[in-house]
Regions:
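Short histidine/acidic/glycine/proline-rich micro-motifs that form metal-
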Residues: 80-81, 133-136, 161-164
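Short gly/ser/thr-rich secondary-structure transition/capping motifs
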Residues: 7-14, 137-139, 200-203
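Class I S-adenosyl-L-methionine
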Residues: 1-103, 109, 114, 209
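Class I SAM-dependent methyltransferase SAM-binding "motif I" and its flanking Rossmann-like core
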Residues: 85-152
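Short, well-ordered secondary-structure micro-motifs
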Residues: 42, 86-87, 115-117, 140-142, ...
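A polyampholytic, Gly/Pro-enriched intrinsically disordered region
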Residues: 71-77, 121-132, 150, 206-214
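A contiguous loop/helix-start segment that scaffolds small-molecule binding in enzyme catalytic cores
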Residues: 2, 73, 151-241
Length: 241
């Protein structure tokens, strides 16, 4: 059997019991090397197969083949495996190859939920996730989604906001949003949510400093009703108070 699990943003406290139990029961754990380090408390003397960045297909294929061979295998993703994780790729590979292998999907806490809880309550109304990584999605497509989300006044959670190879993508996203959102729109940033180097801060669309943002960051841009009170970012649900 192959269990594809989300381990949350990094803290053991943010892992689900189902994910922990799957790790404890597994014979073999497969994952990106950084993520396998985050769950080492549960892997003990189990066989751990680590791969680097941009090896997602190889990682999933290895996990599938081990499960086919009769092993109890866990494939880990950070956050939730079904949100920019390995769940979809595993199902695609199994389907395309017409394999008879049992796949179990175990949810985890995605970064936007963890970040929102640290910032206040910014996701109380409609929101969307947009990844700024153009490795698998053409940048013009991403730009169209940013514009549409801004015009629809969604609260927007930006994943993969900035890296050494994509230093300008987040700034470009904010430029696009400036056409539909006020410069005073609250923005919250959380780095390394649930990990030792966790940081968070609030700013605005117009005052955003992009330099500290990296791939461990989650950026939340509010909607027209979002405000900051006592250092907390709040998007009203719409109750009459």
């Amino acid at each position: 059997m192959l269990s594809v699990i989300g381990i949350g943003p990094g803290s053991q406290a943010m892992m689900t019991m189902e994910a922990i139990e799957a790790l404890q029961a597994a014979e073999i754990v497969v994952g990106y090397k950084t993520y396998t380090h985050l769950v080492k408390a549960f892997t003990g003397d189990k066989q751990v197969i680590k791969t680097g960045m941009c090896k997602e297909i190889e990682r999933c294929q290895a996990a599938i083949e081990l499960a086919q061979a009769g092993h109890n295998v866990v494939l880990i993703s950070s956050g939730d495996a079904g949100i920019y994780g390995m769940a979809g790729l595993v199902l695609e590979l199994v389907g395309k190859q017409k394999l008879d292998v049992e796949v179990r999907l175990i949810p985890g806490m995605t970064a936007s939920i963890a970040a929102a809880s640290l910032l206040g309550a910014p996701l109380m109304h409609d929101f969307c996730h947009i990844s700024l990584s153009d490795l698998l999605t053409p940048w013009p497509v991403i730009e169209k989604r940013i514009v549409a989300a801004g015009e629809a006044d969604f609260v927007i959670c930006f994943y993969n906001p900035r890296s050494r190879g994509r230093e300008g993508h987040l700034a470009r996203a904010f430029d696009l949003l400036a056409a539909s959102k006020s410069a005073q729109t609250p923005v919250g940033v959380v780095k390394s949510a649930g990990r030792k180097k966790e940081e968070k801060w609030l700013t605005t669309l117009g005052d955003m400093d992009f330099e500290p943002v990296d791939m461990t960051s989650l950026v939340i841009v509010g909607n027209k009703t979002t405000y900051v009170q006592d250092g907390l970012m709040i998007t009203p649900r719409g109750y009459t108070l």
